[in-house]
Every structure is written in structure tokens, then in C-alpha cells.
Regions:
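Bergerat-fold GHKL ATPase/HATPase_c domain
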Residues: 1-43
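Glycine-rich/acidic phosphate-handling loop/turn and adjacent ATP-lid/helix
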Residues: 78-106
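Glycine-rich phosphate-binding loop
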Residues: 103-118
Length: 138
């Protein structure tokens, strides 16, 4: 059974990110989730927003973001959508973890982190928006 928990929209900005962090915490408290569950969702949303701010947002572009959180049986399903250029983060190869620290290259670590927290991922480009869906065990 699916139960909608959050549906948030806004123009990408640091202020929007802070508002969404508070909303996630409030929903987590209302549903008695563990601090770890809430923190994981917040980290994922924070990383996604930071990537939008750093890579997808041209000055005054008005990039829109949408967060949907649903309770689906034994999982939480988080869908993050944006009106930026098409970008499938799931096709980017993970960074090499076999290198020494001084050999590691920048880039891709946030996406790797997001994928490592989720138990399932899906991406699609629909209606001029990127839609990244992540599933987490409750």
C-alpha cells in the first residue's frame, strides 16, 4: 500500500534546501522513524541539492525542484525531480575505491554516496524533468 508523506516544490536555492531538511525531520518525527533514517534521507536530499546548485543552475535560471516521499509497503520511496538539463546519475561509473588517497580524483563521490544509501534506484527523463527515484528500507 502506498501512502504519500511529502510533496514539496520550489526554486532551487540554499534556502529551499534548509526548508526541505526541516520538513523531512518533521515527517520523520511524526512517523517515529529512527534518527538514522531521517539523517540518511536528509543527506541524500542535501547532496542532490548541492549538485543542482553546483552543476545544473545557471545564474537566474529559475531551476525548479520537486521532492516526493511515499511510504510503500516496507520501504520509503523518495523521488527527486528537477527542470535542469537531462542527466542520468545512474550511468556515471562509481569512483575507484582501490586507489590510494592521494590518487583519488574529485567528482562523482556524492552520487556514489547517494546510491550506496539506497536499496533501489531508478531514473527517467519525463516532461522536461529529471526524475530520480530512490528506495530505502524502513
Amino acid at each position: 500500500m502506498t501512502h504519500a508523506l511529502l510533496h514539496l516544490k520550489g526554486r532551487v536555492s540554499p534556502d529551499l534546501e534548509a526548508q526541505w531538511m526541516q520538513q523531512l525531520e518533521a515527517v520523520g518525527q511524526a512517523h517515529h522513524w529512527s534518527e538514522l533514517q531521517v539523517h540518511q534521507l536528509q543527506l541524500v536530499v542535501e547532496e542532490w541539492m548541492e549538485n543542482l546548485l553546483a552543476h545544473a543552475l545557471a545564474p537566474n535560471a529559475g531551476l525548479q525542484a520537486i521532492l516526493q516521499l511515499q511510504d510503500v509497503d516496507d520501504e520509503l520511496e523518495l523521488t527527486l525531480s528537477d527542470s535542469g538539463q537531462a542527466f542520468n546519475p545512474l550511468t556515471r561509473p562509481p569512483p575507484s575505491l582501490d586507489l590510494d588517497l592521494d590518487q583519488l580524483q574529485p567528482g562523482g563521490w556524492g552520487l556514489h554516496f547517494i546510491r550506496s544509501l539506497a536499496c533501489g534506484t531508478h531514473y527517467e527523463r519525463r516532461e522536461d524533468h529529471n526524475h530520480l527515484t530512490l528506495r530505502f528500507k524502513k
